[in-house]
Amino acid sequence: MSPRQFLIPNYPWSRVAQYLRQLGTEEIKPYTIDFCNVTVTYKHTSHNESINVSIWAPKPDDWNRRILALGGGGYAATFDHLYQTTAVGKGFVAIGTDSGHSSGMTSAFDTSWALDADGNSNTHLIEDWGFRTLGEMSVIGKHIVEEYYNRLPDYVYFTGCSGGGRQGLVLAQRYPKAFDGILAAAPAINLETFIPAAYWPTQVMRDFNVYPASCEIEAFTTAAIQRCDALDGDEDGYLDARVLSFRSFEADWQRVFL
């Protein structure tokens, strides 16, 4: 195990604030944060992986005595600095693990790490990503916090969406005492069914050698909005899934496409 630590003063939050505004998730003025950046690198006995746990600890006077572990998305176990910056700005110690392979939004759909040099399934690394390193992240994060602040946190939370939501459910199932609260949003579970389902429309188009033009896709969307927009009592261009009653065979497609 190899820990490294750096004091990061006046880290700019402006780029993160700009990104969150683009997502429409939060409207906050840019500011800077001061924190201690600790990275713990380790591997498992008889294995060659390199696992990194990142801990961003705010100054003692700024700490809210809570840890917030941040999940990733897709096949990336964490999104690195993006949400850690936000968490520290709100007073949390932010922690995350890369599970032994590339992390960040640009790595969300990278699966090259799941195969070994011979093209076989890298079972140990897949298990690292699937569950093992998540519990280890909790243990390492709490230990670093106790060493840095000379006390344990009052509460430890986890939050994640999609792939991060899956991580949250795994933590609740396998490590139920690791966190005091888990927010598992839109969990990407049942991989063996939902991933083939996501690719199925593409496969059907390949089988029939028919690929709808973008204007045709837009026509389907327009027809659905025209039929269902007013059902929720507000014609605003958005559909409420709870009241949808659109049936494709009822649309006048000849009028739509001509």
Model-derived features: positions:
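Cap/lid segment of the alpha/beta-hydrolase catalytic domain
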Residues: 24, 64, 74-150, 196
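Active-site glycine-rich loops that stabilize anionic/oxyanionic intermediates
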Residues: 43-45, 72-76
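Catalytic-loop region of hydrolases
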Residues: 1-65, 81-82, 234-239, 248-257
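Surface-exposed patches in mature extracellular/periplasmic domains of secreted proteins
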Residues: 147-158, 234, 238-241
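A catalytic-pocket lid/entrance helix-loop region that shapes and gates access to the active site
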Residues: 170-172, 177-258
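Loop/turn elements at helix/coil->beta-strand transitions in domains of secreted/extracellular proteins
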Residues: 63-67, 90-93, 151-156, 177-181
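Gly/Ala-rich beta-loop-alpha elbow adjacent to hydrolase catalytic centers
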Residues: 159-164, 168
